[in-house]
Amino acid sequence: MAPLKKGGEKKKGRSAINEVVTREYTINVHKRIHGISFKKRAPRAIKEIRKFAMKEMGTPDVRIDTRLNKAVWAKGVRNVPYRMRVRLSRKRNEDEDSPNKLYTLVTYVPVTTYKGLQTVNVDEN
């Protein structure tokens, strides 16, 4: 059994989940829809992108841009691209009566190659 720490005081810092931030990610869609039947591949890819954004940004309200939807569906329902570069933007919700203060907007970033790309913070411009 692990020994108990004495004086277990935690620093009370600000949660990073409440900050407005934008990051670019590469999502491996192929591994997320592996084994899914043909007629459900593109819809499942959209659900998996939504799930990924929810996990990374910590907001239950995720909005997917129409250009990203078109990019997923570009080759049909069964031939979804293997990887996608997306920009996740955590933003403040302007709607006062919404239960969530923040939402995540997922937009498509077209790239020629995925080699050497890493997750990067994008400054708000």
UniProtKB/Swiss-Prot annotation:
PROSITE patterns according to UniProt: RIBOSOMAL_L31E
A GO cellular component entry from the record: cytosolic large ribosomal subunit
MF (Gene Ontology): structural constituent of ribosome
Leader sequence residues: none
The keyword Repeat appears for this protein: no
A Pfam family annotated for this UniProt entry: Ribosomal_L31e
Subcellular location: Cytoplasm
Entry keyword set: Cytoplasm, Ribonucleoprotein, Ribosomal protein
Origin: domain of life: Eukaryota
Gene Ontology biological process terms from the UniProt entry: cytoplasmic translation
Job description of the protein: Component of the large ribosomal subunit. The ribosome is a large ribonucleoprotein complex responsible for the synthesis of proteins in the cell.
Membership in a protein family: Belongs to the eukaryotic ribosomal protein eL31 family.
Subunit structure: Component of the large ribosomal subunit.
Full protein name: Large ribosomal subunit protein eL31
Taxonomic classification: Eukaryota, Metazoa, Chordata, Craniata, Vertebrata
